[in-house]
C-alpha cells in the first residue's frame, strides 16, 4: 500500500492468496475443534447410557467438564440418538424377522397337518356312509325276508283253514260178547235224513255184526207190508231183546247216549 493509501499492483496480485490461506487456517481450526478425543468420547458414551437426552443445564456442565462447547455436546447427543435408534430398529427387525420365520414354519406344518386331517376325515366319512348304506341294504333285506315269511305263513294258515276237516271227537271202540270190535262216532253227513243218521250210528255200534250178515238178516227180514204171523213177530221181538241184552252187558246204554 502506498502513502496515499492506494494498493500497489504487486500487493493486489498477492491479496487473493493471503485470503485463501486465512480461510484454510480457519477451517483447520474448526476441524480440530470438531474432533473429540478418546477421553471425551468415553465420557459422552457413559453419559448417554444413563440419559439419552440432557437438560440444558447438564449440557453446559458436561461441556465445561470436557472442555467443549455446549452446542458440540448437543450435536453429539443428537447424532448418537439417531444411530442408536437405527441400531435398535435393526435389532428389533432381526427379532421380528426371526419370529416371522418361526411362525411361517409353524404355519406350513399346521397347513400340512390340516390337509392330512381333512383327508382322514374324508376317508372316515366315506367309510361311514358305506357302512350305513350296507346296514340299510341288510335291514331292507331282512324286512323283505320277514314280510315274505309272514305272507307265506298267512297263506299256509289260510290254506290249512280251508283244508281243515271238521272237528271229530275221539272214537269210541266197542266190543261185543263175541269179541267183535265196533266204533261209535258222532260225525255224520248233514245231507242224510234222521233215519239215515240213526242207521249210521247203529251200523258203527254194531260193527262186529257186519261179518255175520246172515245173522242180521235172520233177525230182521223184509216183508211186503207187515209180519205174516204173530209167531214171527214174537220171534223177532225175542231175538231183538236178546241182542240188546248182550250188548248192554259190555257197554251200558246210558254211557252211550250221554
From Swiss-Prot:
The keyword Cell division does not apply. Widely expressed. Residues 89-124 are annotated as: Leucine-zipper. Its main location: nucleus. Residues 29-88 bind DNA. SMART domains: HOX. GO terms for biological process: positive regulation of DNA-templated transcription; response to abscisic acid; response to water deprivation. It comes from the Eukaryota. Interacts with TBP2 and TFIIB1. Probable transcription activator that may act as growth regulators in response to water deficit. This is Homeobox-leucine zipper protein ATHB-7. The gene is ATHB-7.
Amino acid at each position: 500500500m502506498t502513502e496515499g493509501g492506494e494498493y500497489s499492483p504487486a500487493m493486489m496480485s498477492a491479496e487473493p492468496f493471503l485470503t485463501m490461506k486465512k480461510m484454510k487456517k480457519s477451517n483447520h481450526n474448526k476441524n480440530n475443534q470438531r474432533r473429540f478425543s478418546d477421553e471425551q468420547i468415553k465420557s459422552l458414551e457413559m453419559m448417554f447410557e444413563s440419559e439419552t437426552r440432557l437438560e440444558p443445564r447438564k449440557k453446559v456442565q458436561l461441556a465445561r467438564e470436557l472442555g467443549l462447547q455446549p452446542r458440540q455436546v448437543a450435536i453429539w447427543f443428537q447424532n448418537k440418538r439417531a444411530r442408536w435408534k437405527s441400531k435398535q430398529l435393526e435389532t428389533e427387525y432381526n427379532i421380528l424377522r426371526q419370529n416371522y420365520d418361526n411362525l411361517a414354519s409353524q404355519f406350513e406344518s399346521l397347513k400340512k397337518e390340516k390337509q392330512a386331517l381333512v383327508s382322514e376325515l374324508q376317508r372316515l366319512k366315506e367309510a361311514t356312509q358305506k357302512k350305513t348304506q350296507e346296514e340299510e341294504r341288510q335291514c331292507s333285506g331282512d324286512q323283505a325276508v320277514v314280510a315274505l315269511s309272514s305272507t307265506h305263513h298267512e297263506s299256509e294258515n289260510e290254506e290249512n283253514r280251508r283244508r281243515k276237516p271238521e272237528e271229530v271227537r275221539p272214537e269210541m271202540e266197542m266190543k261185543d260178547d263175541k269179541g267183535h270190535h265196533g266204533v261209535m262216532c258222532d260225525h255224520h253227513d248233514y245231507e242224510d235224513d234222521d233215519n239215515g243218521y240213526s242207521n249210521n250210528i247203529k251200523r258203527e255200534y254194531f260193527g262186529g255184526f257186519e261179518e255175520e250178515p246172515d245173522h242180521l238178516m235172520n233177525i230182521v227180514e223184509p216183508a211186503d207190508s207187515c209180519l205174516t204171523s204173530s209167531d214171527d213177530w214174537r220171534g223177532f221181538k225175542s231175538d231183538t231183546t236178546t241182542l240188546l241184552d248182550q250188548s248192554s252187558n259190555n257197554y251200558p246204554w246210558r254211557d252211550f247216549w250221554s
